[in-house]
Amino acid sequence: MALSTFKREHIKKNLRNDEYDLVIIGGGITGAGIALDASERGMKVALVEMQDFAQGTSSRSTKLVHGGLRYLKQFQIGVVAETGKERAIVYENGPHVTTPEWMLLPMHKGGTFGKFSTSIGLGMYDRLAGVKKSERKKMLSKKETLAKEPLVKKEGLKGGGYYVEYRTDDARLTIEVMKRAAEKGAEIINYTKSEHFTYDKNQQVNGVKVIDKLTNENYTIKAKKVVNAAGPWVDDVRSGDYARNNKKLRLTKGVHVVIDQSKFPLGQAVYFDTEKDGRMIFAIPREGKAYVGTTDTFYDNIKSSPLTTQEDRDYLIDAINYMFPSVNVTDEDIESTWAGIRPLIYEEGKDPSEISRKDEIWEGKSGLLTIAGGKLTGYRHMAQDIVDLVSKRLKKDYGLTFSPCNTKGLAISGGDVGGSKNFDAFVEQKVDVAKGFGIDEDVARRLASKYGSNVDELFNIAQTSQYHDSKLPLEIYVELVYSIQQEMVYKPNDFLVRRSGKMYFNIKDVLDYKDAVIDIMADMLDYSPAQIEAYTEEVEQAIKEAQHGNNQPAVKE
């Protein structure tokens, strides 16, 4: 129970009393990766997140561990090579949260991709990214392309490219990395905001003053080194330090829409260019839905709640109807949406899609280290780079020595399944185990596929007598209880949006079972009447935002 909600007070006591080699500000995928790398090397690590884990950018992506095909168009050869290699590592270390997905790249007359350039480009991509033989590109005829996805626009179709991306659950990837870090000894807590830095007599950062957002308690965490990994908030965190460079972020917003497959019966993931501006977007089938995105526009508004506007929805609807003309999707067909912010490093005069997705490490005179930019796929390598630097500084300043990076072959929580090649056999073995507990085969398969080697804990929860009084289907009940016991879920939205993903991919379950979820959480976590009221309102607001978005301007007035 290393990341249990029931251990919050114990974790807070340790954070107050101990000194840490490294304190990390930010509980997205970047912070989680740093916590795992540093704790695996033997550092004493603490991490604070002001919201829930992955509540910012790390739950709002296209949910792909990209191989970096788009960077080939910009001739960023090194980025393609590194991204491809990292993608393979992410998959191998957690096949329960990342899975290969064949992607269709239709080629139309006058479109971005011609047959020759696509074949050359995908071939280069295979070589640079070290793609394994079974997943290397295929070039398809018009007939073969339509056989893969009959909904694709036939007019002007010349054929298609066929290559592999890796689909992931970004929020679950983050929490599984975080759980492994906690197992390695990292003290990790959410809903805890860094307010100020503390300094020693040489004006070097030696701690962080924080506030528990659930109880309004203030305390100080002592640290030898502090890393700012706050994603879109890195500039806000740095503003509390006296020593800053002239670097800054440029935020852009990306939006996705979700449509039921009864309306948009997409059977194949497709990567295609839009009619309006030639931007490449994805349409991906998942759990009986099709999701489509993303947009790319500058953003300067409330970072904690970027929303989908009507303009965003219209852009994606037009894109769907252009590439899949027979489906005739309308705004009413959109079940759910999400919007996320990309924390890109400012480059003057560049359009959103032109700004590099590279990451950088900034070191202030105060000793504060900031990691900015970057991509979901590169989280492990980003962590390695900055923890290497932390290790050097700790050796120089304190004479401490730590082992080198060891995360390349380190399974994340739930990833102890015997490697990606054994994963399907592992799932079937767990389905057989579940039969002995009387758990439905489909439910068992979904749970084993989602939770990997942690699934036995969910099967055990299914045997408890409390389930029968819960008014929840077994699958939702065991996921909810597990997320409280093992994944530091405190608020209903932590579960409904991020741990389960239901707010995006099964909003009907949210509407049907939200009250029962709140009842169980209120009982297990001893909510006050005021908390029940506040958290119920938060759920209703999240539903409203997912279903309708609003006309929030990109730039606040």
Swiss-Prot record:
PROSITE patterns: FAD_G3PDH_1 (PS00977), FAD_G3PDH_2 (PS00978). One of its GO terms (molecular function) is glycerol-3-phosphate dehydrogenase (quinone) activity. InterPro entries: DAO_C (IPR031656), DAO_C_sf (IPR038299), FAD-dep_OxRdtase (IPR006076), FAD/NAD-bd_sf (IPR036188), G3P_DH_FAD-dep (IPR000447). It is found in: Cytoplasm. FAD binds at residues 21-49. Gene3D superfamilies: Alpha-glycerophosphate oxidase, cap domain, D-Amino Acid Oxidase, subunit A, domain 2, FAD/NAD(P)-binding domain. GO terms for cellular component: cytoplasm. Pathway: Polyol metabolism; glycerol degradation via glycerol kinase pathway; glycerone phosphate from sn-glycerol 3-phosphate (aerobic route): step 1/1. The keyword Cytoplasm applies. Its cofactor is FAD. Its main location: cytoplasm. It catalyses: a quinone + sn-glycerol 3-phosphate = dihydroxyacetone phosphate + a quinol. One of its GO terms (biological process) is glycerol catabolic process. It is an enzyme of class 1 (oxidoreductase). Keywords: Cytoplasm, FAD, Flavoprotein, Glycerol metabolism, Oxidoreductase. Its EC number is 1.1.5.3. Belongs to the FAD-dependent glycerol-3-phosphate dehydrogenase family. This is Aerobic glycerol-3-phosphate dehydrogenase. It comes from Staphylococcus aureus (strain NCTC 8325 / PS 47). The gene is glpD.
